[in-house]
């Protein structure tokens, strides 16, 4: 079982900076404004050959009436419950506050391995300022700088010293599935439904999710990483820097995933921004599954065909995409959509032998040849698949620059149909032979 280490503390003490420092890249958004991290953010670290899971939590507050602060507190408690080790991060530049005592009291009750981590010693080098934290009664104390890394090596050495060296994390080829869409279409609710618990904060306020959150899903014979992302708005509707970073992180999550589940709000329909997100996924050559969410509002199977046909007309010519009409409340077709996304991931990696490709595709092209141009007969000699991550095929012809777009789509559709590339963008190239 993978060991779990969580970073906790009041707002703006450097938790996300330390999280990014340990996992080795900027997965959490870092800003001087407090309250940026809301959900539990998961990352993975390999230190001295030992792997563990790291959780970044939102800044804990105990008296705020703000709805997000209350939800952050819930996420804080969830993180404590699932952790083996707790890093209590403090900032020596401020006096000890009542909230610090509250956090200390809560974590000490758990009887787990606790580290008091005094941050920002690159700025506040007076070691005597750290003695005030003896009041917490936490014996394992480390002074670090999450900005420049001072002291983090000793901290990590101590953390992993009691871990089993044989612990392993995710398989390297496990499918990564990004849950994407406009704000407030039900992305986090979908993940919480799959997990049967409140992993991510859900409210009726758009923009609740800011970081992209990785979640390991292993149920019903399915194993994959689900990535909950911030809602992607149009650029003109982005009102603050944090939201801009969140949208950029969401787009990055699409690029780093195998398949994207694009969630559409059934009530508002397939809007222009949904088309923009669809194009982002397609242009990055990622697999696509469409989820028409909140279908329980309609609960009308007679509408499905007309709704689906309308969407396929909008997304044409790439409309060979699985479409599911789902509801996070009734759980209709949710598992089926995840299974389809996983299947698409493995089909993305499919490599077709050149002999088989030519045996199946060339007879179709010979039966349906490209129209002649200015009396010139266009012939395709043979084809092969390029060794890239996403499916790309190269066709050798006597006039590569004269191939019409419609014929290119004809080839693409036949490859998709014959070799089960449903939901996968295919790139077709032509070269002179």
UniProtKB/Swiss-Prot annotation:
Residue ranges of domain EngA-type G in the record? 3-167, 175-349
Q: Name one GO molecular function term.
A: GTP binding
Any single GO BP term: ribosome biogenesis
Listed binding positions for GTP 1 are: 9-16, 56-60, 119-122
What sequence ranges are listed for the domain KH-like? 350-433
Q: List UniProt keywords, sorted A-Z.
A: GTP-binding, Nucleotide-binding, Repeat, Ribosome biogenesis
Q: Does the keyword Cell membrane apply?
A: no
| Binding of GTP 2, residues | 181-188, 228-232, 293-296
Family annotation (InterPro entries): G_ENGA, GTP-bd, GTPase_Der, KH_dom-like, KH_dom-like_a/b, P-loop_NTPase, Small_GTP-bd
Q: By its UniProt entry, which HAMAP family does this protein fall under?
A: GTPase_Der
Describe the task this protein carries out.
Answer: GTPase that plays an essential role in the late steps of ribosome biogenesis.
Q: Which family does it belong to?
A: Belongs to the TRAFAC class TrmE-Era-EngA-EngB-Septin-like GTPase superfamily. EngA (Der) GTPase family.
**Subunit arrangement?**
Associates with the 50S ribosomal subunit.
Protein name, per record: GTPase Der
UniProt organism field: Karelsulcia muelleri (strain GWSS)
Gene name of this polypeptide = der
């Amino acid at each position: 079982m993978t060991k779990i280490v969580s970073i906790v503390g009041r707002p703006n003490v450097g938790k996300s900076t330390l999280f990014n420092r340990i996992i080795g890249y900027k997965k959490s958004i870092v800003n001087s404004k407090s309250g940026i991290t809301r959900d539990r953010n998961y990352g993975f670290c390999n230190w001295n050959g030992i792997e563990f899971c790291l959780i970044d939590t939102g800044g804990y507050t105990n008296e705020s009436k703000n709805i997000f602060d209350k939800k952050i507190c819930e996420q804080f408690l969830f993180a404590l419950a699932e952790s083996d080790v707790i890093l209590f991060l403090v900032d020596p530049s401020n006096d000890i506050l009542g909230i610090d005592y509250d956090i200390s009291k809560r974590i000490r009750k758990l009887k787990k391995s606790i580290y008091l981590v005094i941050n920002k010693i690159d700025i506040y080098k007076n070691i005597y300022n750290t003695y005030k934290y003896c009041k917490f009664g936490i014996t394992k104390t480390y002074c670090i700088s999450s900005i420049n890394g001072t002291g983090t090596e000793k901290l990590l050495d101590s953390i992993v010293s009691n871990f089993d060296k044989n612990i392993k994390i995710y398989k390297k080829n496990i499918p990564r599935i990004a849950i994407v869409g406009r704000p407030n279409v039900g992305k986090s609710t979908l993940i919480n439904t799959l997990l049967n618990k409140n992993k991510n904060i859900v409210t009726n306020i758009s923009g609740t999710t800011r970081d992209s959150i990785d979640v390991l899903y292993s149920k019903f014979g399915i194993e994959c990483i689900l990535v909950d992302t911030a809602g992607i708005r149009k650029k003109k509707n982005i009102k603050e820097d944090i939201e801009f970073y969140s949208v950029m992180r969401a787009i990055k999550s699409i690029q780093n995933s195998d398949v994207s589940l694009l969630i559409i709000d059934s009530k508002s329909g397939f809007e222009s921004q949904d088309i923009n997100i669809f194009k982002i996924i397609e242009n990055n050559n990622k697999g696509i599954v469409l989820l028409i969410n909140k279908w329980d509002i309609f609960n009308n199977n007679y509408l499905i065909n007309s709704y689906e046909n309308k969407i396929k007309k909008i997304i044409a010519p790439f409309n060979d995409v699985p479409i599911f009409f789902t509801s996070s409340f009734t759980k209709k077709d949710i598992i089926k959509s995840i299974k389809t996304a996983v299947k698409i991931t493995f089909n993305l990696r499919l490599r077709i032998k050149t002999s088989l490709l030519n045996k199946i595709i060339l007879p179709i092209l010979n039966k349906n040849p490209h129209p002649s141009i200015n009396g010139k007969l266009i012939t395709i000699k043979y084809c092969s698949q390029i060794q890239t991550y996403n499916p790309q095929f190269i066709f050798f012809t006597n006039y590569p620059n004269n191939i019409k777009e419609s014929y290119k789509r004809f080839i693409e559709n036949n490859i998709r149909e014959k070799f089960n590339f449903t939901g996968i963008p295919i790139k077709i190239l032509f070269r002179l032979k």
